[in-house]
């Protein structure tokens, strides 16, 4: 039997444990790093990185989502009108619809005579369009800046990781008795999620892998309806 988990990231976040406005401490660290790397402006499109800064999950699908950061403080967020934001994200939001050229609108706010950082997830169709519009004197990979800042945890993040790890240990203790109750892998998976919710987690960071038998030896096993052959001695 195997229950796959990672104690430092399994419990996504705690109820009321994460804000929904731009984290100024993280933003300051990013802007300082941008200055050090001579990248005065940058486009962040990765929903995970945007959540890291704003505490808000936005999944745009194929549509443009771009957080524009500038060391001069002229920050903008490009969001399609299909994803209206009810809460304050701490940044000016510019909405566009499907009949508008979102990149062209974005290009009106950038500094075209300066280097532009682009993160590693921004689709090429948007990058090429920005290049056509002359949206920067040159384009560089800006992801190492944010990736490094995310790696170095601040005190609040370290505290959350400790709490998450402690909750995870408790969850593992609670799920073990259920292994011998004849549940399918999917049913055990659902029970695992239920336990995390009872312990105060809003959600899991990734889908738990619950596996019996040979599936337990598969590092990427897909949880199914099989049952384990478990005997209590």
Protein language model features and the residues they cover:
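Short, Lys/Arg-enriched N-terminal segments with co-localized hydrophobic residues
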Residues: 9-21
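N-terminal accessory/capping or targeting/presequence segment of soluble
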Residues: 21-108
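Flexible, acidic/His-enriched mid-domain "rim/lid" segments that flank
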Residues: 24-28, 101-204, 215
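Solvent-exposed alpha-helices and their adjacent loops that cap or buttress functional pockets
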Residues: 35-36, 59-60, 69, 108-110, ...
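Conserved acidic residues
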Residues: 40, 114, 231
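Short catalytic-site patches enriched in acidic/histidine residues
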Residues: 50-60, 145-146, 183-233
């Amino acid at each position: 039997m195997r229950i796959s988990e990672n104690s430092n990231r399994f419990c996504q976040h705690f109820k009321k444990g994460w804000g929904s406005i731009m984290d100024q401490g993280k933003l300051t660290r990013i802007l300082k790093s941008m200055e050090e790397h001579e990248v005065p402006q940058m486009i962040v499109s990765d929903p995970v990185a945007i959540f890291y800064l704003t505490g808000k999950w936005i999944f745009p699908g194929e549509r443009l989502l771009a957080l524009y950061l500038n060391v001069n403080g002229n920050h903008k967020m490009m969001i399609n009108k299909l994803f209206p934001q009810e809460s304050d994200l701490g940044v000016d939001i510019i909405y566009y619809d499907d009949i508008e050229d979102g990149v062209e609108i974005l290009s009106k706010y950038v500094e075209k005579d300066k280097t532009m950082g682009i993160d590693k997830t921004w689709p090429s169709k948007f990058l090429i369009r920005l290049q056509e519009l002359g949206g920067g004197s040159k384009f560089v990979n800006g992801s190492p800046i944010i990736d490094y800042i995310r790696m170095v945890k601040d005190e609040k993040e370290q505290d959350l990781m400790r709490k998450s790890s402690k909750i995870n240990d408790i969850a593992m203790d609670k799920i073990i008795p259920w292994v011998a109750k004849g549940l399918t892998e999917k049913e055990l998976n659902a029970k695992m999620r239920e336990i995390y919710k009872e312990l105060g987690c809003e959600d899991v960071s990734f889908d738990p892998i619950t596996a019996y038998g040979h599936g337990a030896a598969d590092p990427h096993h897909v949880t199914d309806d099989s049952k384990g052959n478990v005997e209590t001695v």
